[in-house]
């Protein structure tokens, strides 16, 4: 027992450092997801078709978001280690790489949405009821997409700045910026969706406008603070004096980071493909999944952000050449993440059924959403472990391994299982959803052996 405690349980100083880093990130994402939840409810009050149209577009935006995260994360592997080593010029080059990569992804996404937005939305619409509801949902989805695209550029810029700021251990400012953004989003949503006084009722368009405005507010706060506090953000020294970076630097980040960039993109595309597989069971399934996903995201933030902290803390130890400290911290953080998420899963099981009742939709959709939430709660602790394993491998620059662990697993195991069960079996959609989610158990075994092998204990800078 003593050996177990020594290996997997830290002292007060360890948890204080970990939580000081994690709590602002958890709060930031909690507020963001809470406002997304409120936004979802407000759109849901307009009707099932409006809610479904917006939900489908948000699936497409989800792929874009993850592609941007992948682009900036590729350089973040080096950024955390550069900062740990005190190499501010290297940190500056990683920032440039992030900015260029995020804007390139944005340009590609906007081109796709403009030229083929209707086709992409239609992939998720199957009119099993024969009442024409899918055409209405398509119209609302197109309206929402055309406006929300305007907010993609500030989102890309924010990610480049915020990730670099976090790599220096300053998680408070991105949190404040996020508070301002989501707070304004909530207020603007209420005003523009329903219309108050002289402000007209804009419905779905109002939700999109509110999202775009909040994106710009967040960007302005993050960028202005970073440039006004250059002594704390030394990577900005000379960041805009030129546009290039040493070829060797670019090559190193690109080669190491490409699997990570592709991983985020393919994983997100895989998850949306799984949703598309479910959608053949009808619009009610999409609506139920939308409600369940919104609720689940509120609870998932704990393991997502605890995992992200692993990459920062372990990355800094690796950059400083303290490999044993990196391994020790990683063991303790993984156990802590799984424990916290087991508690969150229990809470989610107890209260998850109350949330769908808030929505203005059918009893069938509410029942589906409740069942989906329960399944997600059961699987959550396993997701916490695999997520922590992923960030452990990533902190040591094992991007090809993470690509195999995440994206290849999704496309080789998860997508085929979802496709076959949804399209070629008579199983109920809840049973299908459970079996697809249960594939995470295979990933747990793979993640355990990968982390245990210490293949990730590498100093790259």
Spans of model-derived segments:
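Short alpha-helical transmembrane segments in multi-pass integral membrane proteins
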Residues: 1-22, 79-151, 199-258, 314-379, ...
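Short runs within selected transmembrane alpha-helices of multi-pass transporters and secretion channels
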Residues: 72, 76, 147-166, 174-185, ...
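Generic alpha-helical transmembrane segments of integral inner-membrane proteins
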Residues: 26, 30, 34, 38, ...
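Transmembrane alpha-helix boundary and packing residues in multipass membrane permease domains
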Residues: 25, 29, 41, 58, ...
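Small-residue hotspots at the loop-to-helix junctions and early N-terminal turns
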Residues: 48-59, 141, 145, 208, ...
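Transmembrane helical elements of multi-pass membrane transporters/channels
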Residues: 20-39, 147, 181, 214-218, ...
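Helix-terminus/linker motif at the lipid-water interface of multi-pass membrane proteins
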Residues: 30, 34-52, 121-135, 191-202, ...
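Small-residue-rich hydrophobic transmembrane alpha-helices
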Residues: 51-114, 155-174, 286-352, 383-405
């Amino acid at each position: 027992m003593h050996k177990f405690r020594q290996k997997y349980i830290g002292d007060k100083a360890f948890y204080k450092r970990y939580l000081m880093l994690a709590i602002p990130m958890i709060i930031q994402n909690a507020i963001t997801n809470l406002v997304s939840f409120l936004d979802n409810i407000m759109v849901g009050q307009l009707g099932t078709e409006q809610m479904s149209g917006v939900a489908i577009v948000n699936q497409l935006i989800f792929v874009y978001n993850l592609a941007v995260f992948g682009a900036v994360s590729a350089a973040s592997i080096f950024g955390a280690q550069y900062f740990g080593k005190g190499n501010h010029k290297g940190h500056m080059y990683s920032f440039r790489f992030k900015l260029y990569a995020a804007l390139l992804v944005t340009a590609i996404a906007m081109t796709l949405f403009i030229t083929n937005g209707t086709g992409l939305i239609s992939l998720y619409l199957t009119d099993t009821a024969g009442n024409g509801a899918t055409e209405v949902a398509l119209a609302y989805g197109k309206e929402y997409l055309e406006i929300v695209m305007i907010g993609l550029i500030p989102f890309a810029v924010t990610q480049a700045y915020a990730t670099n700021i976090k790599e220096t251990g300053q998680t408070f400012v991105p949190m404040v910026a996020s508070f301002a953004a989501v707070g304004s989003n909530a207020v603007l949503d209420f005003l523009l969706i329903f219309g108050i006084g002289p402000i007209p009722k804009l419905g779905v368009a109002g939700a999109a406008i509110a999202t775009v405005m909040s994106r710009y507010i967040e960007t302005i706060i993050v960028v202005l603070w970073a440039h006004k506090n250059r002594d704390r953000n030394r990577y900005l020294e000379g960041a805009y004096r030129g546009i290039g970076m040493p070829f060797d630097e670019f090559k190193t980040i690109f080669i190491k980071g490409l699997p990570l960039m592709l991983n985020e993109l393919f994983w997100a595309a895989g998850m949306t493909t799984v949703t598309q597989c479910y959608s053949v069971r009808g619009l009610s399934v999409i609506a139920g999944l939308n409600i369940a996903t919104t609720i689940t995201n509120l609870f998932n933030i704990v393991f997502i952000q605890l995992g992200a902290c692993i990459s920062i803390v372990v990355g800094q130890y690796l950059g400083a050449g303290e490999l044993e400290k990196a391994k020790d911290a990683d063991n303790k953080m993984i156990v802590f993440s799984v424990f916290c998420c087991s508690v969150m899963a229990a809470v989610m099981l107890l209260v998850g059924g109350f949330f769908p009742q808030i929505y203005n939709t059918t009893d069938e959709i509410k029942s589906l959403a409740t069942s989906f939430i329960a399944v997600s709660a059961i699987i959550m602790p396993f997701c916490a472990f695999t997520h922590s394993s992923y960030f452990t491998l990533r902190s040591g620059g094992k991007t090809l391994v993470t690509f195999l662990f995440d994206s290849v697993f999704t496309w080789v195991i998860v997508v085929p299982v979802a496709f076959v069960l949804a399209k070629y079996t008579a199983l109920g959609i809840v049973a299908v959803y459970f079996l697809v989610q249960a594939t995470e158990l295979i990933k747990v075994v793979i993640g355990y052996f990968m982390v245990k092998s210490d293949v990730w204990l590498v100093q790259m800078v």
